[in-house]
UniProtKB/Swiss-Prot annotation:
The organism's place on the tree of life at top rank: Bacteria
Entries under SMART domains matching the protein: MoCF_biosynth
Intrachain S-S bonds: none
GO cellular component, one term: cytosol
Species of provenance: Staphylococcus carnosus (strain TM300)
Name by which UniProt lists this protein: Molybdenum cofactor biosynthesis protein B
Taxon lineage: Bacteria, Bacillati, Bacillota, Bacilli, Bacillales
GO terms, biological process: Mo-molybdopterin cofactor biosynthetic process
Listed NCBIfam families: molyb_syn
Function: May be involved in the biosynthesis of molybdopterin.
Pathway: Cofactor biosynthesis; molybdopterin biosynthesis
Signal peptide bounds: none
Gene3D superfamilies: MoaB/Mog-like domain
Amino acid sequence: MTKNEHVNVKLDRDIQCAVLTVSDTRTPETDKGGNLAKELLSEINVEIKPEHYAIVKDDKQAITEQLQQWLAEDVDVIITTGGTGIAQRDVTIEAVTPLLSKEIEGFGELFRYLSYAEDVGTRALLSRAVAGTVGEQLIFSVPGSTGAVKLAMNKLIKPELNHLIHELTK
């Protein structure tokens, strides 16, 4: 495939995506990060079914159980928001990484670089954002702030989503 063919990959089916917000305090009404992720996905015609959106507490077991449920339902992509920092309650990465078949190291590296350059400066080093595969499925874990969600979605996830799914399923 040429560079343009990689960029312009068209899938012959709809992408099934889920959004999981990890927070002790957010509700569907106050979940700015998760709601922004859903809105940005709709811009590329990826709609989130009501059963594919959830908020769970900062609890490793609760996060793992929700992820495993969606993975069993053959959701193509799961985006988690929140719980990626270094605070004691930030356990999203500890729940996600044991599930991954392959980590996509470039995602975390680029996310931190772009966060540093375009959003939060040196505070980017606190982010443990990660992405990886589970069989033919993808998981992206990003911080819960709207700035982080917007950056990850617009600069990394949306531009490569079709290509990533194509590569995973060929």
